Amino acid sequence: MPFTLGQRWISDTESELGLGTVVAIDARMVTLLFPATGENRLYARNDSPVTRVMFNPGDTVTSHEGWQLKVDEVKEENGLLIYIGTRLDTLEENVALREVFLDSKLVFSKPQDRLFAGQIDRMDRFALRYRARKYQSEQYRMPWSGLRGQRTNLIPHQLNIANDVGRRHAPRVLLADEVGLGKTIEAGMIIHQQLLAGAAERVLIVVPETLQHQWLVEMLRRFNLRFSLFDDERYAEAQHESDNPFDTEQLVICSLDFVRRNKQRLEHLCDAEWDLLVVDEAHHLVWSEDAPSREYQAIEQLAERVPGVLLLTATPEQLGMESHFARLRLLDPNRFHDFAQFVEEQQNYRPVADAVALLLAGTHLSDEQLNTLSELIGEQDIEPLLQTANSDRDGAESARQELVSMLMDRHGTSRVLFRNTRNGVKGFPQRELHTIKLPLPTQYQTAIKVSGIMGARKSAEERARDMLYPEQIYQEFEGDSGTWWNFDPRVEWLMGYLTSHRSQKVLVICAKAATALQLEQVLREREGIRAAVFHEGMSIIERDRAAAWFAEEDTGAQVLLCSEIGSEGRNFQFASQLVMFDLPFNPDLLEQRIGRLDRIGQAHDIQIHVPYLEKTAQSVLVRWYHEGLDAFEHTCPTGRAIYDSVYEQLIGYLAAPENTEGFDALIQACRKQHDELKAQLEQGRDRLLEIHSNGGEKAQQLADAIAEQDDDTGLVNFAMNLFDIVGINQDDRGEHMIVLTPSDHMLVPDFPGLPEDGCTITFNRDVALSREDAQFITWEHPLIRNGLDLILSGDTGSCTISLLKNKALPVGTLLLELIYVVEAKAPKQLQLNRFLPPTPVRMLLDKNGNNLAGQVEFESFNRQLSAVNRHTGSKLVNAVQQEVHAILQGGEAQVEKAARELIDAARQEADDKLSAELSRLEALRAVNPNIRDDELAAIEHNRQQVLENLNQASWRLDALRLIVVTHQ
């Protein structure tokens, strides 16, 4: 290898040293100085792992002074290169730059530059890079992108709502599904879609204080979204970091009380430029035309400033018309400005709902009914469709569906309101109540008497709360020595029940964490019962482990002991036995407890066991819930309203349970009120809205399509290949689970999304649903997305050399495999990836410029090739550099045609789809005022921006592989 003083070389093994200069040569050794780092290296002259740096005409090089030169000609003088060309800063021509004056911090980013500089990658990394490009491009174009990655069952009505709303520009909608149908999951799916597509980057979730942790857990566990919880303490900390504390995080959860209490805080929230606002339990925002509440006004201020708003609320019929109007007014104050007009409109929708019912029933329509339909739809050329729908011909069913769709588009609040009911969604279990009446121990009787004397000044509500939990009264008097569990008959009953039902998984819920901890100790020490505990004092990871242990079929815990707050946001559909060790104070909390098991996907009827102590508030409450509200065995949409209306009387009975006079009459009155309210709710059901929200056959097809994707072996193969190459250890744990841990030889020191102590993953949705400690890996999971970014944002695998053993070709035949990427650079919110994601174009060129890629498929070709070590590869490249240059130039000429076709097709698709959506909404605007002007303007602006940016799409060489034929 001929060395000359002043020549520039690069190390094959330490490319981070930059450009080296030959500073000393003797008979056997050569010394290189690397000015960028100030280090020297001594190499053997005969076989040193270094590559001569030689640029070619067309390249741009940088001088040590920082200016750049576009190379036109390369001369050699006494073994040193001189580059002649045009200075890019002054445009001066015929400028000479000697190689000794090249910038030492030179970084080779183009694949061909890296190849010629000897920075040759492993062959498996090249293959991974191409697969990553291919898969990423395919995933971007999936129509249900953003709906596959969540750890949830694929429930059609949820997917339907998320698919409709999640793809809108700045969606402003009301999600009003009945309890247990998954409003939180629907909101999470919409948030996930908007974030993934780039339609939103900053999200604020405002919830009641008691639900903050539930949302935090749901967003993290189900959607891999890390929200920050803002309370007084976190807000104070963030004030040191930024003028506006809310600018310190992109995804924030805070309580409604936190928002309402402080005027400056609300101003900071309003100024924080959120893209999406989510408000849970929005029915608690009290409004009247004369006196809106402070909470309502606070959310109204936010809703005026934030483009996208999701309100989660109880069903409209539960709320009353005025309250329902108040929610809609937050979403679109221009459209919903007059309550009286709104009431009139709602009454006018009855014929529409009747028409839909007729169409769905499949019965023949009378002429009068056909005329009504024609008027309601208001299209000029609707007659043929009506005739087909009213016939027995082929296509009658699809014509009916199209008419239903047209009615839904044109009438009602279906664009802003989504509401599913349990009647309209199948798959819920029955609930059976088992009450166990137990005697009140004398120890409790004494403690209650003393408490009554000492607590005479307490309010009725405080006394009522005390009377619900007699063990706490006893413990207060006895202190640490008070062992209530030794005589409380509920403990004896619980132990007896658990020992006689060893094969059953049992969820036990009690109000306080201390009760759960004491019960766990008693069950373990007395009967050896395996019990996990779950309370608010535990971290999310600790709760995950407890939930996972409870979920294990054979070796897991038989019972999970939960506190009221600790169980929020967790669902255990695999269990069907629920024990309420005590009772919650209001019907909402009771429904929340039962809702841990009563979810879609529950395979068995739920057995609810309530052991209660006679002559206590428990005995009063169990009767009121069951006989007055029917709240144990059925969902109780009327519960809160009745609870509020009889609150004072109920508190009186709870505070003094021995006084039963008039209690039977109260129960009867509550039951009568419950039955009447429930009948009103049923009568007021809006079938049209339910059909729209449910999604019908279309929603089922969406769920089926995503389920089919769940079995994608391509993802598993790619992920394992990715983890291997990144250097992540994989340990098969069985049951479709793998443990990933970082290794000491990873491509990057910290792989984003992989904890220091590792994590358990699964590719199986059912396993992920039953094992909360296992992360559910899909194309949308951060581990995969971060892995794709890691590979594709750098130069990993961008150039390699392989040998092809093929005696049918002459030895030394060259092939060049080129991977070009066609892409359009644009702001993320334009979502150009729907039409033109970074798309790989593969070419396999011989020395004559023939493209063989069509005949030679990548994977089968890759299997025929063998790797070359870097040092040998550098020698090969040096020997064939001129030929490679010629083939590369031919490739540049050929790729333009393929790239142009891709860009033109993307432009056409974008124009067709966006124009069609705009035309549809503009036509509907005439008959449905729920279509907002700003939404139409945004779609038109978006269409223009998309087409403009697609016009500027370009292509570049992303990776290349030099293949040399051998016979050995």
UniProtKB/Swiss-Prot annotation:
Interacts with the RNAP. Has a higher affinity for the core RNAP than for the holoenzyme. Its ATPase activity is stimulated by binding to RNAP. Keywords: Activator, ATP-binding, DNA-binding, Helicase, Hydrolase, Nucleotide-binding, Transcription, Transcription regulation. A motif (DEAH box) lies at residues 280-283. The keyword Secreted does not apply. Signal peptide: none annotated. ATP binds at residues 177-184. The keyword Nucleotide-binding applies. SUPFAM superfamilies: P-loop containing nucleoside triphosphate hydrolases. GO terms for biological process: regulation of DNA-templated transcription. The gene is rapA. One of its GO terms (molecular function) is helicase activity. Coiled coil: none annotated. It comes from Cronobacter sakazakii (strain ATCC BAA-894) (Enterobacter sakazakii). This is RNA polymerase-associated protein RapA. Transcription regulator that activates transcription by stimulating RNA polymerase (RNAP) recycling in case of stress conditions such as supercoiled DNA or high salt concentrations. Probably acts by releasing the RNAP, when it is trapped or immobilized on tightly supercoiled DNA. Does not activate transcription on linear DNA. Probably not involved in DNA repair. It comes from the Bacteria. Its EC number is 3.6.4.-. Transmembrane segments: none annotated. Residues 490-662 form the Helicase C-terminal domain. Belongs to the SNF2/RAD54 helicase family. RapA subfamily. The lineage of its organism: Bacteria, Pseudomonadati, Pseudomonadota, Gammaproteobacteria, Enterobacterales. Residues 164-334 form the Helicase ATP-binding domain.
